[in-house]
Regions:
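Short, exposed coil/turn segments at beta-strand boundaries within extracellular/luminal domains
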Residues: 579-589, 677-686
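N-terminal export and membrane-targeting signals
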Residues: 1-7, 16-17
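A mature extracytoplasmic/lumenal domain signature
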Residues: 89, 106, 189, 225-227, ...
């Protein structure tokens, strides 16, 4: 199958939640926008060709055993091959001739054949307009989310936990042990790298690195380990002595620094453990052989080494979620029994069990809770991973800001794990968290201020729910060669979030014209329970009244306050002022001089095409692509907004915007209109025409 070019267009009859005999018809477009070994991303668009709809469920059967692992803009459940996507609270209504879209990540093995048919609200796709069966009552409408998510109160857990320091845990006290592990840090892309420690670009781990991480306030370290390439054949699967000794060395170094240390079977999950449903004996023998050796190595260590059974467990060849839950239960249960039977410190060591795909959907959580209820072991913890609302995490579909979608996804995920586990005495470790596209090698993919708001919210919402968080750092946060943070301000706010809230604002940027009069600008303050204390530039406090005013949560910067730090108004950031609050980290506000960006004609190919762009101090936020009929062009054809960096990227040094081969791989011959959105609010329109592998572009 050619990725991204497959679309299934089907007409369906719809049941209506508002009328028993409504005329209904719809069209469904299913497209795979990205495919990788064992995984894929799909997008689904439903066009309502009949009467308005309020409340919908779209169902289909996967013909090749595919499984959904993560969804957005819909709640997806599965039973065997059958999959059902139900509306979110905010997209239940589909107007006549309106559309609704959702997407998901999934797993596949062998082939990734598209579904052959869909049903909507129980009606088989028929291609015509017909009367729906008698509907079920319409669900209650959900209240509209607030427009300012960072100021909205979170849905409270059943009891607000104390913010006082946790006492020293005693052996066998799982809740106290996990609390003592907060905050945690991942030694990512190191021992999980394939095949060796430095294969993915990070330097060898040193005692100096571990000492530095500990000095920055982290109390636990997760050391992901991939064992696949470091053991012998069946039946013993003997781990290479040098590899096991190196793992033990780094664990011991970490313990000497005072860390709790979590180790696991990492990329083994998709390299061979995923085949367990089809070859239970071979996979289980290998799995138990490895854990028997690992458990034996650390049997007599202190309670601070912690074992995690499997990273992001996933399976192929199953009939659906119910079977996935069962096989994961078997592996988790065998892991617990094996470690406990090894004796010594392992008899009471904290063991960490993941949900399916380490996903926080309620079905995954409930399945793992069943395992906990069966095991009745007091020294267990649950783990999930959190990378935020997917469009924001990768900057696609216009997901450029920390908005209500992002906030609701965060709060919903953390509430579910709190209510399922923590409120019942089972501790939870967010074993990995970050944003997927935030990386020092992809500058601008995630706007800095929006990421700061995400960091602040993760820290707060995890803290009040007693969740321990472990930052996924594959080198994008800490420069391991120089032992310094790549962005000190990001670390400072993260550290502050471990103990208190910080105020933020609607933006960390204020744009002023390169020439011409500067006028006053306003920002909305997100106080987050703090009080605003004033503005500073360096060591100088700005004067209330002359330099700024505050009315409610509206901060107004006067023309004089902006003119002075802007200086000669060179393109770009001319100065940074800070908003200070009664607690937490200050909020940076960059004063940026810019003019509207301009672009010029270009020629190239589908493998090499760059648009000459004079940015004039501005920064690119996102790009839209449309065909002449207004439909989305290029990959992810469920949205006009393309994915930052994967489909396009700015090159500020070369004064160009690069359109990637992955973008052109799914662009049809003909004319495409591109709209570039910049953080100042400016937009440019550019036209490209593809003919085979030749591409021409211009502003008209």
């Amino acid at each position: 199958m050619v990725v991204g070019t497959l679309a299934v267009l089907l007409a369906a009859g719809m049941t209506m939640a508002v009328a028993a005999q409504a005329a209904v018809s719809c069209r469904v477009a299913y497209a795979v926008s990205a495919q990788r070994p064992g995984g894929f991303t799909a997008n689904v668009t439903v066009t309502n060709l009949g009467d308005p709809v309020d409340g919908w469920k779209l169902s289909w059967a996967f013909p090749s055993g595919q499984q959904v692992t993560q969804a957005w803009n819909a709640t997806i459940t599965s039973s065997g091959a059958r999959v059902t996507a139900a509306n979110a609270s905010y997209n239940a209504a589909i107007a006549a001739n309106g559309t609704v879209s959702f997407g998901f990540n999934g797993s596949w093995s062998g082939s990734n054949t598209a579904p052959a048919a869909f049903t909507l609200n129980g009606v088989t796709c028929s291609g015509g307009t017909g009367a729906s069966p008698s509907p079920s009552p319409s669900p209650s409408a959900s209240p509209s989310p607030s427009a300012s998510p960072s100021r909205s109160p979170s849905p409270s857990p059943s009891a607000s936990p104390s913010s006082s320091p946790s006492p020293s845990p005693q052996p066998g006290d799982a809740m106290a042990t996990v609390a003592a592990m907060q905050p945690g840090w991942n030694l990512g892309n190191t021992f999980d790298a394939i095949p060796d420690e430095t294969s993915w670009g990070n330097p060898p781990t040193t005692q100096a690195l571990l000492h530095h991480v500990r000095s920055q306030g982290f109390k636990s370290i997760r050391i992901p380990v991939t064992w696949s390439n470091h053991h012998g054949p069946a039946p013993d699967y003997t781990i290479d002595a040098a590899w096991l000794n190196r793992i033990r060395q780094v664990v011991d170094w970490s313990l000497a620094e005072g860390f709790y240390v979590m180790i696991n079977l990492h990329h083994d999950s998709w390299q061979w453990i995923n085949g367990y449903p089809g070859d239970r004996t071979t996979v289980m023998n290998r799995y138990t052989a490895l854990w028997r050796q690992i458990a034996g190595t650390f049997r007599d260590h202190s309670p601070k080494p912690v074992f995690e059974s499997i990273n992001e467990p996933q399976f192929t060849g199953t009939s659906g979620d119910d079977e996935n839950y069962q096989v994961l239960n078997e592996l988790n249960t065998e892991f617990v029994h094996l470690v406990r039977e090894s004796g010594g410190g392992n008899a009471t060591r904290l063991l960490v069990l993941p949900t399916l795909n380490t996903n926080a959907d309620q079905g995954r959580l409930d399945a793992l809770m069943t395992t906990f209820n069966q095991l009745r072991d007091p020294n267990l913890a649950a783990t999930v991973h959190f990378y935020g609302w997917w469009p924001f995490s990768v900057n696609i579909a216009g997901g450029t800001r920390y908005d209500t979608n992002v906030e609701q996804d965060l709060v919903g995920s953390f509430d579910r794990v709190y209510n399922t586990f923590v409120s019942h005495g089972i501790p939870v470790i967010i074993g990995e968290w970050a944003l997927l596209n935030y990386d020092h090698t992809r500058p601008g993919s995630i706007e800095r201020g929006e990421f700061l708001k995400f960091i602040e919210a993760v820290g707060y919402h995890a803290r009040i729910r007693k969740l321990t968080t472990m930052l996924w750092d594959a080198g994008q946060f800490l420069n391991r060669n120089e032992l310094r943070w790549r962005d000190q301000g990001i670390y400072d706010l993260m550290k502050s979030s471990w103990t208190t809230r910080s105020g933020t604002a609607s933006s960390d940027q204020v744009y002023v014209p390169r020439s011409g009069a500067i006028t006053s600008k306003t920002l909305t303050l997100n106080l987050n329970g703090t009080t605003f204390q004033g503005l500073r530039q360096g060591d100088t406090s700005l004067a209330e009244g002359a330099d700024y005013t505050v009315s409610g949560d509206t901060l107004t910067l006067t023309a004089a306050a902006l003119t002075r730090p802007a200086g000669n108004r060179a393109y770009g950031v001319n100065a940074t002022i800070e908003a200070r609050f009664s607690q937490g980290a200050p909020w940076p506000i960059g004063i940026i001089a810019s003019d509207p960006p301009t672009q010029a004609a270009a020629t190239g190919t589908t493998s090499s095409f760059a648009i000459p762009t004079q940015f004039h101090g501005d920064q690119l936020a996102t790009m839209e692509a449309r065909y002449a009929d207004g439909s989305p062009a290029g990959p992810a054809n469920w949205t006009t907004y393309k994915q930052f960096w994967d489909h396009f990227q700015p090159d500020y040094n070369a004064n160009s915007i690069i359109l990637k081969p992955d973008f052109f791989a799914e662009v049809k011959d003909g004319r495409v209109t591109l709209t570039f959105h910049f953080w100042s609010g400016a937009k440019t329109t550019y036209y490209i025409t593809r003919s085979g592998t030749t591409v021409t572009g211009g502003t008209s």
